[in-house]
């Protein structure tokens, strides 16, 4: 699978919504980054959160390291609020 296709795949990219929101903000604001800072922070926090999950699963020997989309949904539902 190509890198671009993998980044658009919900199973491979847990932060697809945040990616799309950041891109949309940039498009709507003529690429003025300072107007989209909150979107960038949310994306960065999303990547940090799922990277931590991947590291934990790798340490525990759980395969695949990145949970599938359905499993990620269950993980987020088990938390009281969105961690990012």
UniProtKB/Swiss-Prot annotation:
Residue window of motif Cx9C motif 1: 15-25
One GO cellular component term noted in the UniProt record for this chain: mitochondrion
Keywords on record: Disulfide bond, Mitochondrion
Matches recorded under PROSITE patterns: CHCH
Motif Cx9C motif 2, residue numbers: 36-46
Gene Ontology biological-process entries: mitochondrial respiratory chain complex assembly
Disulfide pattern: 15-46, 25-36
Localization in the cell: Mitochondrion intermembrane space
Residue ranges annotated for the CHCH domain, each copy included: 12-54
Similarity section: Belongs to the CHCHD7 family.
Official protein name in the record: Coiled-coil-helix-coiled-coil-helix domain-containing protein 7
């Amino acid at each position: 699978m190509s890198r671009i296709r993998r980044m658009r795949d919900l199973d491979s990219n847990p932060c697809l919504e945040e990616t799309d929101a950041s891109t949309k903000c940039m498009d709507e604001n003529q690429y003025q980054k300072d107007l989209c800072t909150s979107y960038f922070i949310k994306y960065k926090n999303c990547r940090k959160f799922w990277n931590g999950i991947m590291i934990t699963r790798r340490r525990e020997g759980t395969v695949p390291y990145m949970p599938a989309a359905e499993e990620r949904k269950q993980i987020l539902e088990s938390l009281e609020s969105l961690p990012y």
